[in-house]
Amino acid sequence: MAVQQNRKTRSKRGMRRSHDALSASALSVEANTGETHLRHHVSPDGYYRGRRVIAPKHGDETEE
């Protein structure tokens, strides 16, 4: 196994880890229904950018 030659300081460790932070997912609000969804993804009711692109699997919603 590899063993480090010199100990890394807290500063160097922190500088390396500074890029590891997670950011929150960007959410969009659908214009027609007001439902939230991930960017560039179809909303749960089948709308994308104001148009219905997928019919819902459960048949209880009416077509508009």
From Swiss-Prot:
It holds the Pfam family Ribosomal_L32p. The keyword Ribonucleoprotein applies. Residues 1-64 are annotated as: Disordered. InterPro entries: Ribosomal_bL32, Ribosomal_bL32_bact, Ribosomal_zn-bd. It comes from the Bacteria. PANTHER family: 50S RIBOSOMAL PROTEIN L32, LARGE RIBOSOMAL SUBUNIT PROTEIN BL32. Belongs to the bacterial ribosomal protein bL32 family. Residues 7-16 have a biased composition (Basic residues). GO terms for biological process: translation. One of its GO terms (molecular function) is structural constituent of ribosome. The gene is rpmF. It comes from Methylococcus capsulatus (strain ATCC 33009 / NCIMB 11132 / Bath). SUPFAM superfamilies: Zn-binding ribosomal proteins. This is Large ribosomal subunit protein bL32. The keyword Ribosomal protein applies. One of its GO terms (cellular component) is large ribosomal subunit. Keywords: Ribonucleoprotein, Ribosomal protein.
